[in-house]
Curated annotation (Swiss-Prot):
It is found in: Cell projection, Cilium membrane; Cytoplasm, Cytoskeleton, Cilium axoneme. The modification Phosphoserine is found at residue 116. A lipid is attached at residue 2 (N-myristoyl glycine). The lineage of its organism: Eukaryota, Metazoa, Chordata, Craniata, Vertebrata. Keywords: Cell membrane, Cell projection, Cilium, Cytoplasm, Cytoskeleton, Lipoprotein, Membrane, Myristate, Phosphoprotein. It is a lipid-anchor. Residues 1-129 are annotated as: Disordered. It comes from Mus musculus. This is Cystin-1. It comes from the Eukaryota. GO terms for biological process: inner ear development; kidney development; positive regulation of transcription by RNA polymerase II. Expressed primarily in the kidney and liver. Expressed at lower levels in the lung, brain and heart.
Length: 145
């Protein structure tokens, strides 16, 4: 399976502007362009916008500088300023099936070693959504038949 991303790591090609075309040996780049370039320039002036992305000279260096600055600032933020991505989940409700100790369906489900009601200090409780708990119980019932 793929990662789910529709974008690949390819960089889109940029078209060269007519005035930045490479010159051959013995040629010199003309400042005014050629006659076949004139209608294109006139069409751009009439439409009022340039279809090419406006990239100032040294734009790559400026972008890299800004990214470095942002990275340095984000490292200074630290974890105390991070915002949670979603609401905290409540502890799961215990289903009636799990309350019964002598349930034969639970016999095939292995318990994780070291599970105890007491947690060492510094560890946070992992909470699960009730629907996830029910799904796991139904999967256990299905495969323990």
């Amino acid at each position: 399976m793929g990662s789910g991303s529709s974008r690949s790591g390819r960089i889109p090609r940029r078209r060269r502007s007519p005035d930045r075309r490479q010159t051959g040996p013995g040629e010199t780049a003309s400042e005014g362009g050629t006659a076949d370039q004139a209608p294109t320039a006139a069409g751009q002036e009439e439409s009022g916008r340039d279809p090419r992305p406006a990239t100032p000279s040294g734009g790559r260096e400026e972008t890299l500088r800004l990214l470095d600055q942002l990275l340095a600032e984000s490292e200074a933020w630290g974890p105390q300023e991070l915002t949670p991505r979603g609401p905290a989940r409540l502890a799961p409700a215990v289903s009636p099936e799990k309350k019964v100790k002598g349930n034969p369906e639970d016999s095939c489900a292995s318990e994780a070693p070291g599970n105890s009601p007491k947690r060492p200090e510094g560890q946070s409780a992992i909470s699960y959504d009730y629907s996830e708990e029910e799904l796991m119980a139904s999967i256990e019932r299905e495969y323990c038949r």
